[in-house]
C-alpha cells in the first residue's frame, strides 16, 4: 500500500514479497557497515515484516518500517525506519541498497518522510542517528 510519493520515489508498506530483497541488500557488508546490525538473515526480514503488519503510527510509542521503490516499480531499493520517541517526536533512519547510492534517493526519501510525518500525523520534532 502506498504511504506517500516524492518526485522519483514511492514509499509503501513492506510485505512478504519483500523478504528476499530485504535480505539481499541488508546483508551486504557495504550497506550493513552503517547500520546497527552485522549480519541480516531471512529470519530477521520475516520478523520485520510481521512487526510492520502489527504496528500503526501513533503519538505514544512504536516503530514502523516503510519500503522505498522508484515510481512505477515494486522493486525495493531501500527502506525507511520511524520510531516514536515521545509525543510529537520521532527518530528516523534509512537503509539503501548500495547500487542506488549517490543518486539523492536517501535525501529525497528522508525529506518526504519528514513532510509526511508533519503534515499527516502532526509530528514536529525529529531525531536522527548516524552510524560511522
Show which residues each predicted segment covers.
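Conserved acetyl-CoA-binding loop-helix of GNAT-fold acetyltransferases
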Residues: 102-119
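GNAT-family acyltransferases
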Residues: 1-99, 112
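Short glycine-rich loop/turn motifs that provide flexible caps or phosphate-binding loops at active sites
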Residues: 77, 92, 103-108, 127
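Conserved GNAT acetyl-CoA-binding A-motif
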Residues: 120-129
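Membrane-interacting alpha-helical segments
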Residues: 75-76, 130-132
